[in-house]
Design a protein with these regions (language model features):
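ABC-type nucleotide-binding domain
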Residues: 2-209
Length: 209
C-alpha cells in the first residue's frame, strides 16, 4: 500500500566506488510520517547521497534502510519508487508538452492535473498560452516551445510532484535559481502543500529552512 509510517536508517554507510573514504558513515536516523525534515549542509557534505539512498537510487555499502520495518533491499524497485515524488536540482524537462511533462503519460486525470497546476500557481499561466497544456517545452528542440523562467519551472516541478501525490516528497535544492524573496515564498508554498506527507527539504543555505 502507498502508506509510510516510518523510514529508519540503521548504521548506514555509503562509499562511492572510486572514493578513498565513505561519504556517509554509520548513520542512524528515524523519519516518521507527517514530519518535515530540513537537510542543510555545504556542497559535497553528502546531502544528495543521503537522499539518493533514501529513494533507493543507491544501495548502502553498510547497514540497511527499513520502510515500515521492512528492509528496502527486499522491496521491488517499482513499488518502492512509487512512494516518492522527488524534485532534484539537476532535473530537466523533456521536449514534450506541458501536460506530458507533468503527468508522465498520455492517459491522465484532467481534474487532478488542473488541481496540481492550481496548487503550484501555474494554472492561469499555462492556460493563457495559445496551445494551453499542449504547449511544447524545450526551445532547444522546438522553436515554437515556451520558455519558462527559473521560478516558473520550479513551480511546474512542484505541480509534477503534486500530480504524482506520493507519500514522501523530496525537494533537493529546489530554489537554487531564485532570489531570496522568491525562494522564501516557494518554501512556504512547499510547506503548506506537504502537510500529511513525509517531506524532505535539502539546501546549502540555512536561511531557507
Amino acid at each position: 500500500s502507498k502508506s509510510v509510517d516510518r523510514v529508519v536508517f540503521e548504521h548506514v554507510s555509503f562509499q562511492y566506488p572510486s572514493a578513498d573514504a565513505p561519504t556517509l558513515k554509520h548513520i542512524d536516523l528515524t523519519f516518521k510520517n507527517g514530519e518535515k525534515i530540513a537537510i542543510v549542509g555545504e556542497n559535497g557534505a553528502g546531502k544528495t547521497t543521503l537522499i539518493k539512498l533514501l529513494c533507493g537510487l543507491y544501495a548502502p555499502t553498510g547497514g540497511r534502510i527499513l520502510l515500515n520495518g521492512k528492509d528496502t533491499a527486499t522491496i521491488a524497485k517499482n513499488s518502492y519508487f512509487d512512494l516518492f515524488s522527488a524534485i532534484f536540482q539537476d532535473y530537466y524537462f523533456l521536449p514534450m508538452t506541458i501536460q506530458q511533462n507533468i503527468t508522465a503519460s498520455l492517459d491522465y486525470d484532467r481534474e487532478k492535473f488542473d488541481l496540481a497546476l492550481q496548487k503550484a500557481e501555474m494554472y492561469d499561466k499555462v492556460y493563457a498560452l495559445p496551445k494551453g497544456t499542449d504547449t511544447l517545452m524545450d526551445r532547444n528542440v522546438y522553436k515554437d516551445a515556451v520558455d519558462f523562467s527559473g521560478g516558473e519551472k520550479q513551480k511546474l516541478l512542484l505541480a509534477k510532484a503534486m500530480y504524482k501525490d506520493a507519500p514522501i516528497l523530496i525537494l533537493d535544492e529546489p530554489t537554487a535559481a531564485l532570489d531570496p524573496i522568491a525562494e522564501n515564498q516557494l518554501y512556504l508554498k512547499y510547506s503548506e502543500l506537504t502537510d500529511g506527507k513525509l517531506s524532505f527539504f535539502i539546501s546549502h543555505r540555512l536561511s531557507s529552512t
